[in-house]
Amino acid sequence: MHKKIYLSPPHMSGREQHYISEAFRSNWIAPLGPLVNSFEEQLAERVGVKAAAAVGSGTAAIHLALRLLEVKEGDSVFCQSFTFVATANPILYEKAVPVFIDSEPDTWNMSPTALERALEEAKRNGTLPKAVIAVNLYGQSAKMDEIVSLCDAYGVPVIEDAAESLGTVYKGKQSGTFGRFGIFSFNGNKIITTSGGGMLVSNDEAAIEKARFLASQAREPAVHYQHSEIGHNYRLSNILAGVGIAQLEVLDERVEKRRTIFTRYKNALGHLDGVRFMPEYAAGVSNRWLTTLTLDNGLSPYDIVQRLAEENIEARPLWKPLHTQPLFDPALFYSHEDTGSVCEDLFKRGICLPSGSNMTEDEQGRVIEVLLHLFHTVEVKKWTASIR
């Protein structure tokens, strides 16, 4: 059997060992140290914000943002429905209530139309949310300027979940820098990785300092161990920060490679009937973290996942909308249009293809060959049925 092709595996640069060795030589192996400080500073400079706090995951970063915005039990938080569950889980950590917002077709991300309707209704009912979490899916920025403008009009802060979009640019600004807070993920499948890790960023330096405090068990600066509020064990280790520094050095290369992979897929498959790739919104440049497409040719995403799996190739359906997940039942949901849910339609028809930046042309050729054969077989069956 062929070597397995994964959806988005880690891609080491070769420089990671240098920084790991530095951490061991200096004995800075705890969740603090000079490499943590350097990683925070370099990431903040890279995206153009004043401050950043390195933490154990993107989920932890979202949780800290909610803590900083004083989200409490019973408060509502508006959240994009079309996303991974980690976006909304921290809302439940604080016993708040998620209200889900549909996507729109241009970006597949939060619909400003649905958001505006939700905000208008919440204002009438006196239940404005404590925060809005917008997500940049598969590397593509949401219409962040419109979303932030709407939320500003209602006095609601925005958390930008840029877990999948580090390196993406929208209207000349780096992804993750539009809201009150932005978050990034460095999970093993992301465009750069620290094995597990995340970053909370903001232009509010005092808030980021408070985030570091909360992420360090909220330990107060006393000789003895003193704590006056709930804290968390969320800090990133100095060793993993070293991995992050090495990865950040090759971010531009990783973006270029993922965009090349997308282009190769589109050139090979984009002409086929019923195959439509995730559009790139005109105002942005996506990092194309994952190549995604929708099908309208008689095949389901599960047909493709199964066929590729038979060839030892990993693929997955798009995210299942959170408002349809049992965890959040019953869930309040605002759709983009009266005729139905955009994100539910995308989920039913969409698929993610292998997109790792260390995938070779030959490996991608294998994926394309299997898909072309599968699509051709479907067309032949349709043609045969039509002449009977």
Swiss-Prot record:
Modified residues (N6-(pyridoxal phosphate)lysine): K190
Record has Zinc as a keyword: no
Top-level taxon in the UniProt lineage: Bacteria
GO molecular function: pyridoxal phosphate binding; transaminase activity
GO biological process, one term: polysaccharide biosynthetic process
Stated induction or repression of this protein's expression: Repressed by SinR.
Signal peptide: none
Cofactor field: pyridoxal 5'-phosphate
Keywords carried by this UniProt record: Aminotransferase, Exopolysaccharide synthesis, Pyridoxal phosphate, Transferase
InterPro entries named in the record: DegT/StrS_aminotransferase, PyrdxlP-dep_Trfase, PyrdxlP-dep_Trfase_major, PyrdxlP-dep_Trfase_small
Keyword Transferase: yes
Enzyme class: transferase
EC number: 2.6.1.-
Record-stated family: Belongs to the DegT/DnrJ/EryC1 family.
Function as written in the Swiss-Prot or TrEMBL entry: May be involved in the production of the exopolysaccharide (EPS) component of the extracellular matrix during biofilm formation. EPS is responsible for the adhesion of chains of cells into bundles.
Full protein name: Putative pyridoxal phosphate-dependent aminotransferase EpsN
Organism the protein comes from: Bacillus subtilis (strain 168)
Gene: epsN
